[in-house]
Amino acid sequence: MALLDFFLSRKKSTANIAKERLQIIVAERRRGDCEPHYLPQLKRDILEVICKYVKIDPEMLSVKLDQKDDDISILELNVTLPESEAEEVHK
């Protein structure tokens, strides 16, 4: 029965395939364009301040900016702190 379904199934038209691909491309570009230009510098500044008090790897810091509505932006900051006291920076 599966073999019969395979031969009788309708193939997608090239127009539908192209439309789906364009929708994916547009969605990816929208997602990539929403990051403000200052976000990488903000991440570096936050990392610099945290490193004054605790020694962390730059990969342990995650900064994400979400746009909820036209007038609401949420800055999400995740920092994985070291477990041992020995890694703290004393000044």
From Swiss-Prot:
Keyword Cell cycle: yes
Intrachain S-S bonds: none
InterPro entries: MinE, MinE_sf
GO biological process terms on file: cell division; regulation of division septum assembly
Alphabetically ordered keywords of this record: Cell cycle, Cell division
Keyword DNA-binding carried by entry: no
Domain of life: Bacteria
Record-linked Gene3D superfamilies: Cell division topological specificity factor MinE
A Pfam family reported for this protein in Swiss-Prot or TrEMBL: MinE
Function: Prevents the cell division inhibition by proteins MinC and MinD at internal division sites while permitting inhibition at polar sites. This ensures cell division at the proper site by restricting the formation of a division septum at the midpoint of the long axis of the cell.
NCBIfam families: minE, PRK00296.1
Family: Belongs to the MinE family.
Protein name: Cell division topological specificity factor
Species: Erwinia tasmaniensis (strain DSM 17950 / CFBP 7177 / CIP 109463 / NCPPB 4357 / Et1/99)
UniProt lineage: Bacteria, Pseudomonadati, Pseudomonadota, Gammaproteobacteria, Enterobacterales
Gene designation per UniProt: minE
